[in-house]
Amino acid sequence: MFGAEVDVDLRAPVDGETIAAVRAALNEHEVLVVRDQDLSGDDMLALGHAFGELLCNPFSPSADDAPELIIFDNHDENPAALTDVWHADETFRAEPPSVTMLHSLIAPSLGGGTMFASMRAAYELLSERMKAFIEGLTALHDFGRFDGLFPNEPDARARLHQIELAHPHPVHPVVRVHPETGRQVLYVNRHFTRRINELPEDEGAALLEFLLTRPSMPEIQLRVDWRAETLVMWDNRSVQHYACHDYYPQRRRMQRVTVAGDRPVADTPPPPRSVQRVVVPNPPEQPEAASVPRRRVLRPFERTGGEVPVS
């Protein structure tokens, strides 16, 4: 079943048995929703580190003292940018993220939900002939859509060039194999996939556009409606998401960490391990989150002094 709501307390410290159970549930359900999680920034960092190394996103606003902790604080005076598109996170990397964790600090009373689509299901719903046709194809990925975040001035363009050098347009399989479950996944997205390498430009563009529409099928979707202190974790290797920009002028403040992954491959790994359903206790009731003042959070490249983190 795609998506699950689970009861577990993920405030630090979290023991290894709980982490293993959550990881198993994530492999099975792809998206996990955990309500009533009073998580500080340090809690988010600790939880992310329990799953692996954390990445810094050079295009997203982050905490001043922790570039791995992304802060989204959006409202009518600071609308979100480039998130209302179906995408997987950061496939412009040679080794894209494995898991994304997003936690709500302030949630709108209406709207502001996040849509998710299972690209495992998207692949499975293709015809056998289409599966055979796209087998072995590869695609170029880059972050060209984000160039507009950088003003046309020397310092900003120099920072952009620094990021380009760190992430030189990787090639990923159109169909990747999940390294833990062994399931095949359709692995192209509208944010970062530019072209299919093995086809003429016109044929590749037509095929790519068809594949890019697959997340729009309601049969493979779910929607999470946020309320304060909700944590959502998803498998970035097999899930795409879309942030709904339908809540202005209300405010939506979120914190996010992104766990490093491995290089996507098309070869089938050994048979997957069995997955156990998670049974965890209900968390204790948490106090209401304190109000947070409005202050635009800076992206790494907007800060002065020091290099842009590009890990």
Feature map (PLM): residue ranges:
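Non-heme Fe(II) oxygenase catalytic core, chiefly the N-lobe of the double-stranded beta-helix
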Residues: 1-231, 236-311
